[in-house]
């Protein structure tokens, strides 16, 4: 009888159900269900339809029954920072806002009136981003204070879905850490900070580590999907799950979780909370088994995704890589952090205008456009590596690139050249794999994180890129 585990991995633009099993000591993956996701525009607000998302979770579970592949457990990961407030009857209070909604505009100034930004970073080790939950809750306090008064529980979105499946409310640590309300020394909510900000402290449940059992399915869910299983906590912040799947078996290395955004950093047993780290905008997010993900959020592949989209998705990412390499002599450079690239109506025009404005040759072909972007991305990776090593006080000899961007061979080679380090690329499905690893360790099928990573290295193709001499 084959033993299946189910990873439900929900990103901001799509979600999928992936079944995993161990076959001769190797992890086998099978995607069985996929669905669209996105924030809904409603009355000028950007909202998540959590009922629809929960319906998709259940629909994917039914697919397991159809296929005759019943998992022993499941875990859910999503993006960070978004949450629901539940009343005494466990109903959601108000709307479920998406992190891109503008209600947090100016909320950093409101929080800073109570607590300076340097003090907030010193307490939590989390980089300031205007969509962090700490600012979202300040928006609630300012705009709809009655919701905070009526709230009995705050649950991050994956924890809310776990509650809907099992009837049990648990709060998971890695995603909790992204709220900017967690004490990195205790791995629990910073109740003093929460009180100081005027948020009700009793709505925050004790934080639990990945690998904790949430519960069995509620009878009505069992009836609907046709089976029972155990719901388990994974690193429910998707990046925490992805970093679990970094196939680093010994020594220290830098990782890049490469997708729409690139998250570049190291794993540490202690948070790095210094003035230099704060100035360079590095964050200390929670990781598996009391680890920290000391990382920086940098522009990822979304400039490439935008260019591809403007050409009606006519080229695959592999083709774009090849075309960029063919145009590698094209000399122009752009600054990826320039405001003009944040959300332009046309990324192609934004790149061309930047080159024109700065007196450089203007890229015309797709290859020239993508060449400009890939090289500047590699350059920003190089700068981030140098900053990271300076702050950490040590050098690293390798970089592991995981996630969808690990398939961009040309970018991987440019990254090796720009950093002077050996690059190991893969696996591409890192988030779902990390989700499954937490379940497999919980079940005793894998001994610990070290053996889980060894298993990843042996299960998936990892490509090596050496820096040019």
PLM feature spans:
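Carbohydrate-associated surface elements
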Residues: 101
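Active-site core segments that coordinate phosphate-bearing ligands/cofactors
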Residues: 2, 6-7, 19, 112-125, ...
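Short beta-strand-loop/turn "lid" adjacent to the catalytic site in phosphate-handling enzymes
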Residues: 62, 66-98, 127-131, 162-183, ...
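N-terminal glycine/serine-rich phosphate-binding loop of ATP-dependent small-molecule kinases
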Residues: 1-94, 122, 222-231, 419-421, ...
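Short glycine-rich phosphate-binding loop at a beta-alpha junction
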Residues: 70-78, 153, 206, 394-403
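A conserved helix-loop-beta module that forms one wall/lid of the active-site cleft
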Residues: 191, 197-212, 436
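Short, basic and Ser/Thr-rich N-terminal targeting/leader segments
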Residues: 11-13, 72, 77-79, 133, ...
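Pocket-flanking alpha-helical
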Residues: 84, 106-110, 242-244
């Amino acid at each position: 009888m084959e033993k299946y585990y189910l990873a439900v991995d929900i990103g901001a633009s799509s979600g999928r159900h992936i079944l995993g099993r161990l076959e001769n000591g190797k992890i086998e993956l099978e995607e069985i269900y996929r669905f669209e996701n996105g924030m809904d525009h409603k009355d000028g607000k950007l909202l998540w339809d959590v009922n629809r998302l929960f319906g998709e979770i259940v629909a994917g579970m039914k697919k397991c029954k159809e296929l005759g592949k019943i998992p022993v457990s499941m875990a859910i990961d999503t993006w960070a920072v978004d949450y629901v407030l539940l009343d005494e009857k466990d109903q959601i209070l108000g709307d479920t806002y998406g992190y891109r909604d503008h209600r947090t505009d100016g909320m950093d100034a409101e929080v800073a009136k109570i607590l300076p930004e340097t003090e907030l970073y010193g307490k939590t080790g989390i980089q300031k981003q205007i969509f962090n939950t700490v600012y979202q809750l300040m928006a609630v306090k300012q705009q709809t204070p009655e919701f905070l008064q009526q709230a009995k529980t705050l649950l991050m979105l994956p924890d809310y879905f776990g509650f809907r499946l099992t009837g049990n409310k648990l709060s998971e640590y890695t995603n909790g850490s992204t709220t900017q309300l967690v004490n990195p020394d205790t791995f629990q909510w910073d109740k003093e900070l929460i009180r100081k900000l005027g948020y009700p402290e009793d709505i925050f449940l004790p934080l639990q580590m990945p690998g904790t059992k949430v519960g069995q399915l509620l009878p009505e869910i069992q009836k609907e999907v046709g089976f029972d299983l155990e719901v388990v906590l994974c690193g429910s912040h998707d990046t925490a799950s992805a970093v679990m799947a970094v196939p680093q078996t010994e020594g220290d290395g830098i990782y890049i979780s490469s997708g729409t955004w690139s998250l570049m950093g190291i794993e540490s047993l202690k948070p790095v909370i210094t003035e230099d780290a704060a100035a360079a905008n590095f964050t200390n997010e929670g990781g598996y088994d009391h680890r920290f993900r000391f990382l920086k959020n940098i522009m990822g592949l979304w400039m490439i995704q935008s260019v591809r989209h403007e050409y009606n998705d006519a080229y695959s990412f592999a083709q774009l890589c090849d075309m960029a390499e063919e145009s590698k002599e094209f000399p122009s450079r752009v600054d990826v952090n320039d405001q003009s690239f944040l959300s332009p109506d046309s990324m192609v025009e934004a790149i061309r205008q930047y080159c024109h404005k700065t007196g450089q040759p203007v890229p015309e072909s797709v290859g020239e456009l993508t060449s400009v972007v890939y090289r500047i991305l590699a350059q920003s990776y190089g700068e981030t590596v140098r900053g990271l090593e300076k702050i950490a006080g040590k050098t690293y000899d390798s970089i592991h690139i995981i996630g969808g961007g690990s398939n961009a061979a040309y970018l991987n080679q440019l990254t090796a050249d720009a950093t002077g380090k050996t690059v190991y690329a893969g696996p591409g499905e890192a988030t779902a794999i990390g989700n499954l690893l937490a379940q497999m360790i919980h079940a005793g099928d894998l001994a610990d994180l070290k053996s889980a990573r060894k298993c990843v290295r042996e299960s998936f193709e990892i490509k090596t890129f050496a820096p040019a001499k």
